[in-house]
Amino acid sequence: MPVPPISELNLRTEAFIGGSFVPAADGRTFDAVSPRDGAVLAQVARCGAEDVDRAVKAARRAFERADWALADPAQRGRVLKRLARLMRAKLERLAWVEALDTGHPIANARAVDVINSANCFAWYGEAIDKVYGEIAPTAADALALIDREPLGVVGAVVPWNYPLIITAWKLAPALAAGNAVVLKPAEQSPLSALVLAELATEAGLPEGILNVVPGYGEEAGEPLGRHPDVDKIAFTGSVPIGRRFLSYAGESNGKAVSLELGGKSPQVVLADAADLQAAAESIAWGIFYNAGQTCHAGSRVVVEQAVADELKERTIAAARTFVPADPADDDTIFGALISAEHRDSVDGHLQRARQDGAQFLYDGGAGDDGGAAEPVPGGAYMSPVVIDSSDDPARAIVREEVFGPVLTVQVARDLDHALELANATSYGLAAAVWTRDVSKAGRIARRLRAGTVWVNSFDISSMTTPFGGSRDSGHGRDRSLHALHSYSQLKTTWIAL
């Protein structure tokens, strides 16, 4: 399918503050560059501290106005469900904006990014009027009500790898709970958040309840994190920046902070795995989907020695089907990395691995691409890589998050060794185990240090299940009622009878 002209996408490029699109206070802009071909899609408002302050003040006024915070929860739900319907109605526009801004294959942008984001708003729209308070046990002369109320102003800072989905994960529960939000999208992929602000207004969200301040982290993200009138920061991104937000909170008003900071997720394949072909295909999808730019990507395989050679052979064959191709082609399954700079960062990890003596089992080359087009000149493309690091589990390529299409394999002597290798990381986001013994799988899942453990599968999820981790993967959860509760606080009302 041909790429639609940019003019037909009706891009929004200004900040969204207090219900209106406005330029940055100082008039500055930055280029939104497509990783597909390096083309400049638009000049976007480059917000700074003054713009963030305007947005926070607009959010606070809207929250105190209380037409959203104290509205019937069912009314808030109707607005969120209306937004979900608008997103589905504007599927092509949103999908193309996301594909061109991130390098996601257009088929994935349609079927995953837009649909899952719309479903997230619809889910919280349905859930919000089904959350009940409590009555505490008291003597007969008192009534103690325990209820939840919104926090106030939430600052949401989202990354570039899944900008629409992760924005929905933050916005939907925060808005459902009755908060006002200031959203700072990543400077590498700001466009879908601005379109979403337009659709939210059309859906009936009151002015000031959602504000969007595109810009660079140190110019817009830090002022948001330090602002004394922000009640919570919800951040997804890197470990170093997440730690900064903890510092910003401590140095300002002690605001709540939830962090999702990435991972180095292991897939543990045991000798009794029922279907090595299914495991190999799932492993390939688990790391090479979105060119490996997924926080919980299954970037490490730990396999028992008895089946190691066969699994490596099957996994390499599966990797060959992921050939870099034009994200605008409907047949593409493996698009671009977010930028040439990020591609160079991934390549730096690979160069270091070569210097460290790692064995490269597969490093691109010809494969069956299913008829997808060739990569576009000027784009940020990279082939899949499979590395065996069984001889040195301490290599940086095994321990550090690469955030690219790079899979490492380690061979384990037995189950205990496999668990030792799987847990030899500072992260704790996700893991998988492949075995035909469900009882064994249950025992292993308890020993894997991860917020989510899949058994005989990978990256299967639902809005009903929480997502998040521990240690360097952060704390707090997206999705599910657990996320909804994290955007509210408990209040006790004691009534003397």
What are the functions of these language-model segments?
Residues 38, 76, 98, 178, ...:
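Residue-level signal for inorganic ion chemistry
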Residues 39-131:
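Glycine-rich loop-to-alpha-helix module at the N-terminal edge of alpha/beta enzyme cores
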